[in-house]
A protein has these predicted regions:
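A general sequence property marking short-to-moderate contiguous segments
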Residues: 1-7
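Exported/periplasmic cell-wall-interacting domains
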Residues: 76-170
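Gly/Pro-biased beta-strand-loop elements
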Residues: 7-115, 119
Length: 170
């Protein structure tokens, strides 16, 4: 497994913050609080359009490394369950979060624009807007169920900093 070279503690990890660990092999995201207590696990993908060990090219797997969640886009909060089909809703689902690279693995791989989101154009409409849409590979982002992003990740962003460690096959 290849993962981050730094830890959340290197960036001021404190009480109220959360550490999400994304394992592309097991397709699971696990949340831990500041004290190391496991909060929950949810299904997710960190899978792109290339081979299982490629994250250095556009549209391939999420680059391994340490990120923090940045800007939050709560489309579900704006339009609710019965949204009209549009490209953003189709591709990104209910909620999306910018992922800010902290250990520069994203930049070192020549990548940019990595996010965590739901949706999935491959699910069609209204499938991409379903609470538990089919998890299809992305162009390099972390994808989780729409309902998990709204109910589990979004509240964490209101409590503190959310750090994300992405682990990939080597």
């Amino acid at each position: 497994m290849i993962g981050p070279t730094k830890k959340p503690q290197d960036f001021g990890f404190k009480d109220g913050d959360t550490h999400l660990i994304v394992n592309d092999i097991t397709e699971v995201m696990t949340a831990y609080d500041f004290h190391g207590n496991k909060r929950w696990e949810i299904p997710c993908l960190a899978r792109g359009q290339g081979s299982d060990t490629d994250w250095k090219h556009p549209r391939t797997d999420t680059p391994p490394g340490l990120y923090k969640l940045g800007a939050v886009y709560d489309d579900y909060g704006k339009v609710g369950l019965h949204a009209a089909c549009d490209r953003t809703h189709l591709a990104y689902g209910w909620c999306s979060f910018d992922m800010v690279s902290l250990d520069h693995h994203e930049e070192d791989a020549g990548r940019a624009g990595i996010m965590m989101h739901g949706g999935g154009s491959g699910c069609g409409w209204p499938g991409a807007w379903a609470p538990k849409q089919h998890l299809v590979p992305t162009f390099g982002c972390v994808r989780a169920y729409n309902s998990d992003l709204r109910d589990k990740i979004l509240p964490l962003t209101k409590k503190g900093t959310v750090f994300v460690s992405v682990f990939q096959e080597g």
